[in-house]
From Swiss-Prot:
This is UPF0434 protein M446_0487. It comes from the Bacteria. It comes from Methylobacterium sp. (strain 4-46). One of its GO terms (cellular component) is cytosol. Belongs to the UPF0434 family. Disulfide bonds: none annotated.
Length: 66
C-alpha cells in the first residue's frame, strides 16, 4: 500500500499578514486558512496562496459572492 502524504494548510506569518494590504484598496486582508486565500472585503476579492506564497495580483484573485 502506498502512503499518501497528508497536505497541511499553509500558515501565514501574522507579521506578514500585518504588512500585506490589498493592492487595489490598500485595505487590510483576512486570512482564510480553509481556502488558502487572503480576503479583501473592501475589494470583494480573494487572493490565492500557492505553495505558501500570497499571489497579490488582482487578475489572479477570485471575486467574492455578495
Amino acid at each position: 500500500m502506498a502512503d499518501t502524504p497528508s497536505v497541511e494548510p499553509t500558515r501565514i506569518d501574522p507579521k506578514l499578514l500585518e504588512l500585506l494590504v490589498c493592492p487595489l484598496t490598500k485595505g487590510r486582508l483576512e486570512y482564510d486558512s480553509a481556502r488558502q486565500e487572503l480576503i479583501s472585503r473592501s475589494a470583494k476579492l480573494a487572493y490565492p496562496i500557492r505553495d505558501g506564497i500570497p499571489i497579490m495580483l488582482p487578475e489572479e484573485a477570485r471575486p467574492l459572492a455578495e
